[in-house]
Design a protein with these regions (language model features):
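A short alpha-helical element within helix-turn-helix/winged-helix DNA-binding domains
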Residues: 295, 300-305
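Structural recognition of the conserved hydrophobic beta-strand(s) that form the central parallel beta-sheet
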Residues: 155-161, 182
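Residues in the helix-turn-helix
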Residues: 311
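Interdomain motor-coupling "hinge/lid" segment immediately C-terminal to the ATP-binding subdomain
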Residues: 39-41, 169-289
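A cross-kingdom feature that marks ATP-driven nucleic-acid transaction machinery
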Residues: 1-81, 85-100, 105-107, 314-318, ...
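Helical "lid/switch" subdomain of P-loop NTPase nucleotide-binding domains
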Residues: 60, 133-136, 140, 162-166, ...
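Conserved nucleotide-sensing/catalytic segment adjacent to the nucleotide-binding pocket
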Residues: 113-157
Length: 478
C-alpha cells in the first residue's frame, strides 16, 4: 500500500490515521462511509494508511495517467485485491487540482440512488468521476456515455473486478470510447520500494533484442544482489503477487488465500451470473487449477464432474471474466496450418493455482510455467503497445510455451523449472522460430529464443537462443 505522496486519496471516516505528508489533494467520496471528504468540490488533506503493507510502485501507473488525460473514459479492471483502488490514490499528477468524486457500487444504497437518476447524480462540478465495481451496475454506462459524449472535459474512470468488456452490454456501450487497462497482481519487478518501479530484464530485451541479453551475460549482478533477487523470485513464484500477502507469515497467507476463494464463491460470482451448485463449481475450480499449463478440454472436465460440457464452458467463462484463469490462444499464422487450435489454461496467480490444484497434484513444472505466464501477462499490461502473446504447438508435437510478437520482433520463450538449461533445450525454439519465419510471422523482424530457468547464469545455448534465469528476466535491471 502506498504512503502519501502526490496523490488523490481516500480517508476512512472511522479511523484517525496519521498523515505522512501534509496538504495533498484528496478524492472525495459521494457516500461510502469508509471515505471522508466534505461535500464541496474542494480537496481535503490526506491521511496515509497504517496497514503495514509497504508501498510498491505499480508499473501501470504512468500508462493509466496518460490514458486518463487522453480519453474521456478509462476502464481499469482486474481481480479483487490487486490494488485498483490503491492505484487511484496515486493516479493524478502532482499539483493537479481538478475536483473529483468517487462512487462505490459495492454500496447498495449508492446503487439505488444512482439508479433513480444516474445522469443528475453523475453530472455536477466534478471533472474526474470514479465508479468503483462498475460490473455491479452496468446500466450506468448509458449515463456515462451520454455525459462523455457532451465533450465538456469531464473524465470517467471505471474500476471493475471483472473483464467488463466481455459483457455484451458493456462492450456495445463503450465501443470506440474507452481506454482499456488491466491491473494484475504484483509483478516481480514491482517488489521494490521507491517512487517508481525500475525496468526489468525483459523490458531491455524487448527494446534491444539479443544485445541486451549479451550485456546481461557480460555484466552479472553482485553476489548480494543475486542472492536477494533469487530469494525474492523464489518467494514471489511460491506465494504470487497479491499485495496483501506480503507482510504475512506463511500460515496467515494460506488463510488469506482460502478466504479469498470463499469470498469469490460467496460474493463475486453473484456479479457474473447464477451458479446453482457452489460445491460443484468449487470442485471445477480444483480440477481446472490442477490442469494449469495444459490444453483445455471441456469434455474431460465435464466427465470428471459428471456434468454437461456447456456447464463446464459456463464455469470457465465465469473464471475467465473474473480474472481467476487465463486462456492462452495458439498462434495461427495461416488458416491451413496444421496446428493445435485448443487454448491452454493457466491460473492467473501461482499461489492460488498451488492451493486449488494441490489435492489433484499439479506438477512443479506446470506451476513454474504458470508463474512465467503470469509474469508475461503483467509485463504486457504495462506496455503502451502490448505485444501479442500466444503459444505454438503442432499436431506432430513441436511446441514452444510462449510467443511474444509484434510486427518487428518475435521472442519465443520456453519455461524450464530446472537450475540449468542444456543445448538440447534450444532445439524447439530454433525450429519454431524458423517455422514462423517460413510462415511469414517473423518476416524481417528480429527473432530471439529464451529458455527461462531457476538458475544463476545467463548463457548462450545456440545461435539466437539464450538461457536466462527467471529473476534476471523479470527482476530489475542493474
Amino acid at each position: 500500500m502506498p504512503d502519501a505522496r502526490s496523490i488523490w486519496s481516500f480517508m476512512p471516516r472511522t479511523a484517525s490515521w496519521p498523515s505522512r505528508s501534509p496538504s495533498l489533494p484528496q478524492l472525495r467520496s459521494s457516500s461510502d462511509p469508509r471515505w471522508s471528504c466534505k461535500y464541496s468540490l474542494k480537496f481535503c488533506s490526506i491521511a496515509a494508511n497504517t496497514t503495514g503493507v509497504g508501498f510498491h510502485p505499480r508499473r501501470l501507473l504512468a500508462l493509466l495517467r496518460a490514458r486518463l488525460a487522453a480519453r474521456p473514459i478509462t476502464v481499469l479492471t482486474g481481480a479483487r485485491q490487486t490494488g485498483k483502488t490503491t492505484i487511484v490514490r496515486d493516479l493524478l499528477p502532482a499539483g493537479g487540482d481538478l475536483p473529483s468524486v468517487y462512487f462505490s457500487l459495492d454500496d447498495p444504497d449508492e446503487r439505488l440512488r444512482l439508479a433513480a437518476d444516474p445522469v443528475r447524480r453523475l453530472d455536477h462540478g466534478a471533472r474526474i468521476v470514479v465508479l468503483d465495481e462498475i460490473q455491479k451496475q452496468p446500466a450506468l454506462l448509458d449515463a456515462v456515455k451520454l455525459l462523455a459524449d457532451r465533450g465538456e472535459g469531464r473524465r470517467f474512470l471505471l474500476l471493475g473486478s471483472a473483464q467488463v468488456l466481455l459483457l455484451r452490454q458493456v462492450r456495445e456501450t463503450l465501443a470506440g470510447r474507452a481506454a482499456l487497462l488491466e491491473l494484475w497482481p504484483l509483478g516481480l519487478v514491482e517488489r521494490v520500494e521507491g517512487p517508481e518501479a525500475p525496468l526489468s530484464g525483459l523490458d531491455q530485451i524487448w527494446r534491444e533484442g539479443e544485445a541486451a541479453v549479451r550485456r546481461m551475460a557480460e555484466s552479472p549482478p553482485s553476489a548480494d544482489d543475486a542472492r536477494l533477487w533469487r530469494g525474492r523470485a523464489e518467494e514471489h513464484f511460491l506465494w504470487g503477487g497479491y499485495p496483501a500477502l506480503e507482510p504475512m507469515p506463511p500460515e496467515e497467507r494460506r488463510a488469506w488465500l482460502r478466504d479469498f476463494r470463499r469470498t469469490y464463491l460467496g460474493r463475486d460470482l453473484a456479479d457474473l451470473g447464477r451458479v446453482a451448485d457452489l460445491d460443484q463449481f468449487a470442485l471445477a475450480q480444483n480440477l481446472l487449477a490442477a490442469r494449469t499449463g495444459q490444453l483445455l478440454s471441456h469434455s474431460e472436465v465435464a466427465r470428471e464432474l459428471g456434468v454437461a460440457v456447456n456447464t463446464v464452458k459456463r464455469y470457465v467463462r465465469f473464471l475467465e471474466i473474473s480474472y481467476q484463469l487465463f486462456l492462452l490462444r495458439p498462434l495461427q499464422p495461416t488458416v491451413t496450418a496444421r496446428l493445435v487450435k485448443s487454448p491452454k489454461l493457466y491460473w492467473t496467480d501461482p499461489a492460488l493455482a498451488r492451493l486449488l490444484g494441490e489435492r489433484a497434484g499439479a506438477a512443479d513444472g506446470a506451476l513454474f510455467e504458470t508463474a512465467i505466464l503470469d509474469e508475461l501477462l503483467r509485463w504486457a499490461s504495462w506496455q503502451p503497445e502490448p505485444p501479442a502473446l500466444h503459444f505454438f504447438r503442432t499436431h506432430a508435437g513441436r511446441e514452444v510455451d510462449f510467443i511474444l510478437h509484434a510486427p518487428d520482433r518475435v521472442v519465443a520463450i520456453e519455461a524450464k523449472s530446472s537450475e540449468r538449461a542444456h543445448r538440447t533445450d534450444a532445439r524447439p525454439l530454433t525450429e519454431v522460430l524458423g517455422a514462423l519465419t517460413m510462415r511469414g510471422v517473423a518476416g524481417d523482424a528480429w527473432r530471439l529464443g529464451l529458455v527461462v530457468t531457476r538458475g544463476r547464469e545467463v548463457e548462450p545455448l545456440a545461435p539466437g537462443v539464450w538461457a536466462v534465469p527467471d529473476w534476471r528476466l523479470f527482476g530489475p535491471v542493474g
